[in-house]
UniProtKB/Swiss-Prot annotation:
It catalyses: (R)-4'-phosphopantetheine + ATP + H(+) = 3'-dephospho-CoA + diphosphate. It is found in: Cytoplasm. ATP binds at S9, F10, H17, G88, L89, R90, E98, Y123, S124, F125, L126, S127, S128, S129. PANTHER family: PHOSPHOPANTETHEINE ADENYLYLTRANSFERASE. It holds the Pfam family CTP_transf_like. Homohexamer. It comes from Acetivibrio thermocellus (strain ATCC 27405 / DSM 1237 / JCM 9322 / NBRC 103400 / NCIMB 10682 / NRRL B-4536 / VPI 7372). Transmembrane segments: none annotated. This is Phosphopantetheine adenylyltransferase. The keyword Cytoplasm applies.
Length: 159
């Protein structure tokens, strides 16, 4: 069984992420969307909230599972018996960072492959930080995030 892992902070999940999830899920038997605890970031949404938002967003995609992890991605990959990392790219600037990470992961485990997927051009401008900024100022996030989580995101910033 082929298991791919799509890691990220997903703070929050956007339609750009969903584009990658939907397309990557067609390439494997199981796609694990891995919500990471990143000590270098201060997420707005808690780990539990990010997992819950993703679970809502992927309802109906049968071969997608949502999990969280901390530590090295390579260790999580081994635990999941996965050899493929999925990374979404919006622009060349994303590629530079992700290439470094892919090479580092390859150095740690030569059996690991990183599959880069370009996001749909309709989402090439979209980031979690832009969604947070819009929501923080009561801006319109319609079409930027899955409908089932839009109100939860806006509610987070109304507090």
């Amino acid at each position: 069984m082929s298991v791919f892992v799509y890691p990220g902070s997903f703070d929050p999940v956007t339609n750009g992420h969903m584009d990658i999830i939907q397309r990557a899920a067609k390439l494997c038997d199981k796609l694990v969307v891995a919500v990471l605890v990143n000590s270098s970031k201060n997420p707005v949404f808690t780990l539990e909230e990010r997992v819950d938002l993703l679970k809502c967003a992927v309802k109906g995609i049968d071969n997608v599972e949502i999990e969280s992890f901390s530590g090295l991605l390579i260790d999580f990959m081994r635990k999941k018996n996965s050899k493929v990392i999925i990374k979404g790219l919006r622009a060349v600037s994303d590629f530079e960072y992700e290439l470094q990470m892919a090479l580092l992961n390859k150095n740690l485990d030569s059996d690991i492959e990183t599959l880069f997927m370009m996001t749909n051009i309709n989402y090439s401008f979209l980031s979690s930080s832009s969604v947070r900024e819009l929501a923080r100022h009561n801006g319109n996030i319609d079409g930027l995030v899955p409908d089932c989580i839009k109100d939860k995101i806006m509610d987070k910033f109304r507090r």
